A protein has these predicted regions:
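Alpha-helical multi-pass membrane segments and their bilayer interfacial helix-loop junctions
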Residues: 42-45, 70
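Aromatic- and glycine-enriched glycan-recognition loops and surfaces
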Residues: 44-52
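Alpha-helix capping/helix-boundary segments
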Residues: 102-103
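Aromatic/His-enriched, Gly/Pro-containing loop or helix-boundary segments
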Residues: 119-124, 142-144
Protein backbone atom coordinates (compact mmCIF):
# COMPACT_ATOMS: atom_id res chain seq x y z
CA UNK A 1 0.00 0.00 0.00
CA UNK A 2 1.28 3.47 -0.93
CA UNK A 3 0.18 6.70 0.67
CA UNK A 4 -0.29 9.78 -1.45
CA UNK A 5 1.97 12.80 -1.00
CA UNK A 6 -0.66 14.76 0.92
CA UNK A 7 -3.52 13.89 3.28
CA UNK A 8 -6.81 12.88 1.67
CA UNK A 9 -9.40 15.57 1.16
CA UNK A 10 -12.56 15.48 3.27
CA UNK A 11 -15.66 16.42 1.29
CA UNK A 12 -18.97 17.18 2.98
CA UNK A 13 -22.49 17.62 1.58
CA UNK A 14 -24.59 20.78 1.57
CA UNK A 15 -28.26 20.99 0.70
CA UNK A 16 -28.27 24.74 1.30
CA UNK A 17 -26.73 27.47 3.47
CA UNK A 18 -27.02 25.91 6.98
CA UNK A 19 -25.30 22.71 5.86
CA UNK A 20 -22.65 24.60 3.89
CA UNK A 21 -21.72 26.69 6.92
CA UNK A 22 -21.77 23.64 9.20
CA UNK A 23 -19.34 21.83 6.90
CA UNK A 24 -16.93 24.76 6.91
CA UNK A 25 -16.99 25.11 10.69
CA UNK A 26 -16.50 21.37 11.23
CA UNK A 27 -13.34 21.24 9.12
CA UNK A 28 -14.30 20.08 5.62
CA UNK A 29 -11.64 20.57 2.95
CA UNK A 30 -14.33 20.72 0.28
CA UNK A 31 -18.11 20.97 0.06
CA UNK A 32 -20.22 19.55 -2.74
CA UNK A 33 -23.65 20.88 -3.58
CA UNK A 34 -26.09 20.93 -6.46
CA UNK A 35 -28.17 23.39 -8.40
CA UNK A 36 -31.93 23.14 -8.77
CA UNK A 37 -31.57 21.26 -12.09
CA UNK A 38 -29.28 18.51 -13.39
CA UNK A 39 -28.73 17.20 -9.86
CA UNK A 40 -29.37 13.82 -8.27
CA UNK A 41 -30.98 15.60 -5.29
CA UNK A 42 -33.90 17.55 -6.75
CA UNK A 43 -35.40 18.96 -3.53
CA UNK A 44 -32.29 20.81 -2.36
CA UNK A 45 -29.60 22.96 -3.90
CA UNK A 46 -28.69 26.50 -4.81
CA UNK A 47 -30.13 28.68 -7.53
CA UNK A 48 -27.93 30.03 -10.30
CA UNK A 49 -28.26 33.41 -8.63
CA UNK A 50 -26.99 32.02 -5.30
CA UNK A 51 -24.13 30.07 -6.87
CA UNK A 52 -21.45 32.83 -6.92
CA UNK A 53 -22.05 33.64 -3.25
CA UNK A 54 -21.89 29.96 -2.26
CA UNK A 55 -18.56 29.51 -4.03
CA UNK A 56 -17.18 32.76 -2.61
CA UNK A 57 -18.26 31.82 0.93
CA UNK A 58 -16.34 28.56 0.68
CA UNK A 59 -13.25 30.14 -0.85
CA UNK A 60 -13.13 32.78 1.88
CA UNK A 61 -12.55 29.90 4.30
CA UNK A 62 -10.06 28.08 2.05
CA UNK A 63 -12.65 25.39 1.30
CA UNK A 64 -13.12 24.01 -2.20
CA UNK A 65 -16.47 24.22 -3.99
CA UNK A 66 -17.59 21.25 -6.06
CA UNK A 67 -20.88 21.49 -7.96
CA UNK A 68 -22.84 18.37 -8.87
CA UNK A 69 -24.11 17.91 -12.43
CA UNK A 70 -24.58 14.22 -11.81
CA UNK A 71 -27.49 13.26 -14.05
CA UNK A 72 -27.89 12.18 -17.64
CA UNK A 73 -28.75 14.99 -20.06
CA UNK A 74 -31.09 14.70 -23.04
CA UNK A 75 -30.58 16.44 -26.37
CA UNK A 76 -33.52 18.77 -25.69
CA UNK A 77 -31.73 19.97 -22.54
CA UNK A 78 -28.34 20.79 -23.99
CA UNK A 79 -28.90 24.54 -24.28
CA UNK A 80 -29.89 24.70 -20.60
CA UNK A 81 -26.96 22.45 -19.71
CA UNK A 82 -24.55 24.81 -21.46
CA UNK A 83 -25.94 27.78 -19.55
CA UNK A 84 -25.62 25.98 -16.23
CA UNK A 85 -22.06 24.84 -16.94
CA UNK A 86 -21.06 28.34 -18.02
CA UNK A 87 -22.48 29.71 -14.75
CA UNK A 88 -20.59 27.10 -12.71
CA UNK A 89 -17.37 28.06 -14.48
CA UNK A 90 -17.99 31.80 -14.11
CA UNK A 91 -18.68 31.40 -10.38
CA UNK A 92 -15.20 29.95 -9.91
CA UNK A 93 -16.16 26.46 -8.78
CA UNK A 94 -13.20 24.15 -8.27
CA UNK A 95 -14.80 21.24 -10.12
CA UNK A 96 -18.05 19.94 -11.57
CA UNK A 97 -19.09 16.37 -10.74
CA UNK A 98 -20.64 14.68 -13.78
CA UNK A 99 -22.25 11.38 -14.73
CA UNK A 100 -22.84 11.91 -18.44
CA UNK A 101 -19.70 11.55 -20.59
CA UNK A 102 -21.32 13.87 -23.12
CA UNK A 103 -21.48 16.54 -20.43
CA UNK A 104 -17.84 15.84 -19.54
CA UNK A 105 -16.89 16.46 -23.17
CA UNK A 106 -19.05 19.59 -23.24
CA UNK A 107 -17.21 20.98 -20.21
CA UNK A 108 -13.90 20.56 -22.02
CA UNK A 109 -15.34 22.39 -25.01
CA UNK A 110 -16.97 25.41 -23.34
CA UNK A 111 -15.12 25.62 -20.00
CA UNK A 112 -11.68 24.03 -20.45
CA UNK A 113 -10.43 25.50 -17.17
CA UNK A 114 -13.17 23.82 -15.11
CA UNK A 115 -12.06 20.54 -13.57
CA UNK A 116 -14.26 17.48 -14.15
CA UNK A 117 -14.81 14.76 -11.56
CA UNK A 118 -16.49 11.52 -12.57
CA UNK A 119 -19.53 10.91 -10.35
CA UNK A 120 -20.27 7.68 -8.50
CA UNK A 121 -23.33 7.66 -10.79
CA UNK A 122 -20.93 6.52 -13.53
CA UNK A 123 -20.69 3.18 -11.66
CA UNK A 124 -16.92 2.96 -12.10
CA UNK A 125 -15.74 -0.29 -10.54
CA UNK A 126 -12.41 -0.97 -12.28
CA UNK A 127 -9.19 0.69 -13.38
CA UNK A 128 -10.47 0.43 -16.95
CA UNK A 129 -13.53 2.44 -15.94
CA UNK A 130 -11.27 5.04 -14.37
CA UNK A 131 -9.25 5.25 -17.59
CA UNK A 132 -12.46 5.71 -19.61
CA UNK A 133 -13.58 8.59 -17.39
CA UNK A 134 -10.11 10.14 -17.55
CA UNK A 135 -10.16 9.93 -21.35
CA UNK A 136 -13.24 12.16 -21.21
CA UNK A 137 -11.48 14.71 -19.04
CA UNK A 138 -12.04 13.49 -15.48
CA UNK A 139 -9.21 14.49 -13.16
CA UNK A 140 -10.83 12.54 -10.34
CA UNK A 141 -13.21 9.59 -10.27
CA UNK A 142 -15.68 8.85 -7.48
CA UNK A 143 -15.68 5.06 -7.35
CA UNK A 144 -18.81 2.97 -6.95
CA UNK A 145 -20.00 2.47 -3.37
CA UNK A 146 -20.30 -1.24 -4.05
CA UNK A 147 -16.54 -1.89 -3.89
CA UNK A 148 -14.60 -3.60 -1.12
CA UNK A 149 -11.28 -2.49 0.33
CA UNK A 150 -9.61 -5.22 -1.72
CA UNK A 151 -11.25 -3.87 -4.88
CA UNK A 152 -10.10 -0.35 -4.06
CA UNK A 153 -6.56 -1.55 -3.46
CA UNK A 154 -6.41 -3.22 -6.87
CA UNK A 155 -7.74 -0.12 -8.64
CA UNK A 156 -5.34 2.18 -6.78
CA UNK A 157 -2.40 0.00 -7.84
CA UNK A 158 -3.44 0.25 -11.50
CA UNK A 159 -4.00 4.00 -11.93
CA UNK A 160 -2.56 7.37 -10.94
CA UNK A 161 -5.87 9.21 -11.48
CA UNK A 162 -7.27 10.78 -8.31
CA UNK A 163 -9.72 8.44 -6.58
CA UNK A 164 -12.56 9.42 -4.27
CA UNK A 165 -14.71 7.10 -2.15
CA UNK A 166 -17.80 7.48 0.01
CA UNK A 167 -17.14 6.83 3.69
CA UNK A 168 -20.50 7.64 5.29
CA UNK A 169 -24.19 7.81 4.50
CA UNK A 170 -27.03 6.13 2.66
CA UNK A 171 -26.53 3.25 0.23
CA UNK A 172 -28.58 2.31 -2.82
CA UNK A 173 -29.87 -1.23 -3.21
CA UNK A 174 -28.98 -0.86 -6.89
CA UNK A 175 -25.86 0.67 -8.38
CA UNK A 176 -26.18 4.35 -7.53
CA UNK A 177 -28.35 6.19 -10.03
CA UNK A 178 -29.12 3.09 -12.07
CA UNK A 179 -32.33 1.92 -10.36
CA UNK A 180 -35.44 2.14 -12.55
CA UNK A 181 -38.07 1.02 -10.03
CA UNK A 182 -39.04 4.56 -9.01
CA UNK A 183 -39.65 5.63 -12.60
CA UNK A 184 -41.43 2.38 -13.49
CA UNK A 185 -43.76 2.38 -10.49
CA UNK A 186 -44.29 6.04 -9.74
CA UNK A 187 -43.09 8.05 -12.72
CA UNK A 188 -40.33 9.64 -10.62
CA UNK A 189 -36.82 9.42 -12.04
CA UNK A 190 -34.16 8.33 -9.58
CA UNK A 191 -31.57 9.76 -11.96
CA UNK A 192 -33.14 13.20 -11.57
CA UNK A 193 -33.15 13.21 -7.79
CA UNK A 194 -36.82 12.24 -7.49
CA UNK A 195 -36.36 8.69 -6.24
CA UNK A 196 -39.51 7.33 -4.56
CA UNK A 197 -37.28 4.85 -2.70
CA UNK A 198 -39.07 1.62 -3.44
CA UNK A 199 -36.22 -0.02 -1.55
CA UNK A 200 -37.51 1.52 1.69
CA UNK A 201 -40.98 -0.07 1.46
CA UNK A 202 -42.22 -3.12 3.35
CA UNK A 203 -42.69 -6.26 1.25
CA UNK A 204 -44.28 -9.68 1.52
CA UNK A 205 -42.18 -12.67 0.52
CA UNK A 206 -43.63 -15.60 -1.42
CA UNK A 207 -41.46 -18.72 -1.79
CA UNK A 208 -42.67 -21.47 -4.14
CA UNK A 209 -46.20 -20.12 -3.91
CA UNK A 210 -46.28 -19.99 -0.12
CA UNK A 211 -46.14 -16.87 2.03
CA UNK A 212 -43.01 -16.67 4.15
CA UNK A 213 -43.47 -15.28 7.65
CA UNK A 214 -41.17 -12.28 7.99
CA UNK A 215 -42.27 -10.95 11.38
CA UNK A 216 -40.48 -7.58 11.77
CA UNK A 217 -38.08 -8.11 8.85
CA UNK A 218 -40.27 -6.89 5.97
CA UNK A 219 -37.94 -4.23 4.55
CA UNK A 220 -36.25 -6.69 2.24
CA UNK A 221 -34.52 -4.16 -0.02
CA UNK A 222 -33.51 -1.46 2.46
CA UNK A 223 -29.73 -1.28 3.02
CA UNK A 224 -28.16 0.01 6.18
CA UNK A 225 -26.06 3.17 6.15
CA UNK A 226 -22.35 3.23 5.46
CA UNK A 227 -19.92 4.14 8.23
CA UNK A 228 -16.22 3.67 7.50
CA UNK A 229 -14.58 5.32 10.52
CA UNK A 230 -12.77 2.10 11.37
CA UNK A 231 -11.56 1.77 7.78
CA UNK A 232 -10.10 5.29 7.54
CA UNK A 233 -6.50 4.19 8.33
CA UNK A 234 -6.65 1.52 5.61
CA UNK A 235 -8.12 3.97 3.10
CA UNK A 236 -5.41 6.52 3.91
CA UNK A 237 -2.64 3.96 3.58
CA UNK A 238 -3.84 2.54 0.27
CA UNK A 239 -3.80 6.01 -1.26
CA UNK A 240 -7.38 7.24 -1.63
CA UNK A 241 -7.32 10.95 -2.50
CA UNK A 242 -10.69 12.10 -1.16
CA UNK A 243 -13.25 10.88 1.38
CA UNK A 244 -16.86 11.80 0.76
CA UNK A 245 -19.81 12.02 3.14
CA UNK A 246 -23.26 11.41 1.65
CA UNK A 247 -26.18 13.52 2.78
CA UNK A 248 -27.35 16.54 0.79
CA UNK A 249 -30.84 15.87 2.20
CA UNK A 250 -29.55 15.78 5.78
CA UNK A 251 -29.67 18.68 8.24
CA UNK A 252 -26.83 20.84 9.53
CA UNK A 253 -26.41 18.79 12.72
CA UNK A 254 -25.72 15.67 10.65
CA UNK A 255 -23.23 17.52 8.45
CA UNK A 256 -21.43 19.03 11.44
CA UNK A 257 -21.17 15.77 13.37
CA UNK A 258 -20.10 13.52 10.50
CA UNK A 259 -17.61 16.09 9.21
CA UNK A 260 -16.06 16.45 12.66
CA UNK A 261 -15.86 12.67 13.08
CA UNK A 262 -14.06 12.07 9.79
CA UNK A 263 -11.87 15.17 10.16
CA UNK A 264 -10.56 13.73 13.42
CA UNK A 265 -10.18 10.22 11.99
CA UNK A 266 -8.30 11.38 8.88
CA UNK A 267 -5.95 13.61 10.87
CA UNK A 268 -5.19 10.79 13.31
CA UNK A 269 -4.60 8.25 10.54
CA UNK A 270 -2.34 10.60 8.59
CA UNK A 271 -0.26 11.27 11.72
CA UNK A 272 -0.31 7.54 12.55
CA UNK A 273 -1.84 8.28 15.92
CA UNK A 274 -4.09 5.87 17.79
CA UNK A 275 -7.34 5.79 15.81
CA UNK A 276 -9.52 4.25 18.52
CA UNK A 277 -13.11 5.35 18.03
CA UNK A 278 -14.81 7.00 20.98
CA UNK A 279 -17.97 5.03 21.91
CA UNK A 280 -19.70 8.33 22.67
CA UNK A 281 -19.04 9.46 19.09
CA UNK A 282 -20.55 6.25 17.75
CA UNK A 283 -23.65 6.84 19.85
CA UNK A 284 -23.90 10.38 18.50
CA UNK A 285 -23.62 9.14 14.91
CA UNK A 286 -26.34 6.58 15.56
CA UNK A 287 -28.53 9.28 17.05
CA UNK A 288 -28.11 11.98 14.38
CA UNK A 289 -29.15 9.60 11.57
CA UNK A 290 -28.80 5.87 11.13
CA UNK A 291 -30.52 2.94 9.45
CA UNK A 292 -27.89 0.75 11.07
CA UNK A 293 -24.27 1.79 10.58
CA UNK A 294 -21.44 -0.39 9.28
CA UNK A 295 -18.74 -0.76 6.62
CA UNK A 296 -21.04 -2.97 4.51
CA UNK A 297 -19.69 -3.22 0.94
CA UNK A 298 -16.22 -2.11 2.04
CA UNK A 299 -16.04 -5.36 4.01
CA UNK A 300 -17.27 -7.40 1.00
CA UNK A 301 -20.63 -7.97 -0.65
CA UNK A 302 -23.07 -9.79 1.63
CA UNK A 303 -26.67 -8.63 1.30
CA UNK A 304 -27.65 -10.67 4.35
CA UNK A 305 -25.58 -8.16 6.33
CA UNK A 306 -26.12 -5.00 4.27
CA UNK A 307 -29.91 -5.45 4.34
CA UNK A 308 -31.20 -6.27 7.82
CA UNK A 309 -34.86 -5.88 6.90
CA UNK A 310 -36.06 -4.16 10.06
CA UNK A 311 -35.86 -0.43 9.46
CA UNK A 312 -36.40 1.71 6.34
CA UNK A 313 -35.54 4.99 8.04
CA UNK A 314 -33.75 6.53 10.98
CA UNK A 315 -33.60 4.08 13.88
CA UNK A 316 -32.12 6.30 16.55
CA UNK A 317 -30.04 5.04 19.43
CA UNK A 318 -30.69 1.62 20.93
CA UNK A 319 -31.36 1.99 24.64
CA UNK A 320 -31.87 -1.67 25.45
CA UNK A 321 -34.46 -4.44 25.57
CA UNK A 322 -37.90 -4.03 27.14
CA UNK A 323 -38.17 -6.60 29.93
CA UNK A 324 -41.34 -5.43 31.64
CA UNK A 325 -44.19 -2.97 31.12
CA UNK A 326 -45.87 -1.52 34.21
CA UNK A 327 -49.23 -0.36 32.87
CA UNK A 328 -50.42 0.90 36.25
CA UNK A 329 -47.50 3.29 36.59
CA UNK A 330 -47.14 3.96 32.88
CA UNK A 331 -43.53 2.77 33.04
CA UNK A 332 -41.29 0.53 30.95
CA UNK A 333 -38.37 -1.40 32.43
CA UNK A 334 -35.44 -1.63 30.02
CA UNK A 335 -32.32 -3.77 30.27
CA UNK A 336 -29.31 -2.01 28.72
CA UNK A 337 -27.70 -3.66 25.69
CA UNK A 338 -24.70 -5.89 26.24
CA UNK A 339 -21.27 -4.36 25.62
CA UNK A 340 -20.84 -6.29 22.35
CA UNK A 341 -24.27 -5.37 20.93
Amino acid sequence: MTRRARPPELMSPAGHWPQLRAAIEAGADAVYFGLRHFSARAKVGFTLEELPEAVATLHERATKAFVTFNTLAFEREMAAAERALAAIDAAGADAVIVQDVGIADLVREIAPGLAVHGSTQMSVTSAQGVAFAAAHGARRVVLGRELSLADLRRIRAATDVELEVFVHGALCVSYSGQCFSSEAWGGRSANRGQCAQACRLAYDLVVDGADRALLDERYLLSPGDLMALAQVPDLVDLGIDAFKIEGRYKDADYVALTTHAYRSAIDAAWARRDAAIDPALLRDLEQVYSRGLGPWFLAGTDHRVVVRGRAPGHRGLRLGTVVRVDAARGAVVVAPPAADE
